[in-house]
């Protein structure tokens, strides 16, 4: 299982939110590129980026910070937040992102996901953010009646590289991941599923790994708070 350290970008800074609330942002640094380089130096295989302003605005907002990160690191990076059309997808992939994450648009325009996955094989992921099993969009501000598992299954034949499943109520709360829901989603589809939201300790990571169904896990606040030791986590996952 791959550990994806998270860099959430708000106003050019590295922050973490509590359950997706922009007003509940904790600033962890003003040099996201240096943070990405530190994750790479520690041995991370990937870096997970989120343009928080972009998720709410529906267009890229923290482009300068993302480009600075891409210029600093050699490991692959994936980005979500505000990516809602083919032009933006193509632009980011040309700029050096390994993978784009489509969230809101996966609900509102699933045909775009299929088109992008065909055009850029292996480089398009779907972000499914859910509260009590129901998908939320537009930076989690809008709740839908779409069930997370149904949305995941609808992309089974689309060629998407991964599904990033976030349990909103666990995100940034240090409350532990929703292992049962994530495992159930991962077993419902053949697409690799990456868990996000609530990873707060090494035990959480190992519990996700031990399901045998989950391909990766994203962690942010726990790494910044020191609750999860990155070196120890990487060693444990490779053991």
Swiss-Prot record:
Q: Which CDD domains match?
A: HisA
- Which key words tag this protein in UniProt? Amino-acid biosynthesis, Cytoplasm, Histidine biosynthesis, Isomerase
Gene Ontology cellular component terms for the protein in this record: cytoplasm
Q: Which reaction does it catalyse?
A: 1-(5-phospho-beta-D-ribosyl)-5-[(5-phospho-beta-D-ribosylamino)methylideneamino]imidazole-4-carboxamide = 5-[(5-phospho-1-deoxy-D-ribulos-1-ylimino)methylamino]-1-(5-phospho-beta-D-ribosyl)imidazole-4-carboxamide
**Which GO BP terms, alphabetically?**
L-histidine biosynthetic process; L-tryptophan biosynthetic process
Pathway listed for it is: Amino-acid biosynthesis; L-histidine biosynthesis; L-histidine from 5-phospho-alpha-D-ribose 1-diphosphate: step 4/9
> Can you say where in the cell this protein is located?
Cytoplasm
Q: Which SUPFAM superfamilies match?
A: Ribulose-phoshate binding barrel
> Which catalytic residues are annotated?
8 (proton acceptor), 129 (proton donor)
EC number, as in UniProt: 5.3.1.16
In terms of superkingdom, the source organism counts as Bacteria
Question: Which molecular function terms from Gene Ontology are attached?
Answer: 1-(5-phosphoribosyl)-5-[(5-phosphoribosylamino)methylideneamino]imidazole-4-carboxamide isomerase activity
Family according to the record? Belongs to the HisA/HisF family.
Record protein name field: 1-(5-phosphoribosyl)-5-[(5-phosphoribosylamino)methylideneamino] imidazole-4-carboxamide isomerase
- The source organism is Cereibacter sphaeroides (strain ATCC 17023 / DSM 158 / JCM 6121 / CCUG 31486 / LMG 2827 / NBRC 12203 / NCIMB 8253 / ATH 2.4.1.) (Rhodobacter sphaeroides)
């Amino acid at each position: 299982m791959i550990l994806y350290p998270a860099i959430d970008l708000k106003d050019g800074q590295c922050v973490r939110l509590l359950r997706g609330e922009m007003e509940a942002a904790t600033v962890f640094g003003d040099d996201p590129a240096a943070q990405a380089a530190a994750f790479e130096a520690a041995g991370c295989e990937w870096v997970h980026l989120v343009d928080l302003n972009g998720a709410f605005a529906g267009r890229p907002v923290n482009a300068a910070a993302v480009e600075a990160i891409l210029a600093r690191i050699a490991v692959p990076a994936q980005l979500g937040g505000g990516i809602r059309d083919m032009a933006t997808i193509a632009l980011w992939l040309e700029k050096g992102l390994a993978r784009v994450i489509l969230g809101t648009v996966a609900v509102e325009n699933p045909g775009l996901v299929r088109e992008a996955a065909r055009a850029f094989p292996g480089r398009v992921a779907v972000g499914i953010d859910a509260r009590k099993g129901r998908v939320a969009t537009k930076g989690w501000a809008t709740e839908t009646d779409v069930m997370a598992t149904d949305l995941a299954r609808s992309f089974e034949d689309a060629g998407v590289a991964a599904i990033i499943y976030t349990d909103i109520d666990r995100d940034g709360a240090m409350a532990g991941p929703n292992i049962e829901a994530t495992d159930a989603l991962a077993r419902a589809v053949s697409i690799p599923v990456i868990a996000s939201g609530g990873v707060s300790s090494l035990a959480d990571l190992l519990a996700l790994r031990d399901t045998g169904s989950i391909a990766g896990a994203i962690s942010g606040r726990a790494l910044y708070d020191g609750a999860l030791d990155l070196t120890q986590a990487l060693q444990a996952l490779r053991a």
